[in-house]
């Protein structure tokens, strides 16, 4: 794990490249009606992370509760993974899109969202968030070395 390779004197990151690759279209689920953004299910994200990086550490650091009722409405998660020989920790918040009227179910949904958002910060499924502005996979692709990606201003 963590194999780095060099091309033209530049260190390239094989695992980061693998994480940045777009998911096949048939693995991407359409957003429910009235919701924004297609998605890749949690188990697929988990399998890909294990396939590319091996075991990882995942922790729900804190449950976020609604002030008046105390119901779980989100969570703060932390994901630690070794990528190309470097230990990387990312954090993100996951919310409860549809209240399940049960703290356990709400925590499970929030954890799933938090985990996927953490994985996105490592490149997994990032193309779904970035849309047409996604370029990371091409930038990291060893075949694309020498080609410059023209960045657009926001």
Tell me what each language-model feature is.
Residues 9-42:
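Contiguous, often N-terminal, cationic amphipathic patches that form binding interfaces
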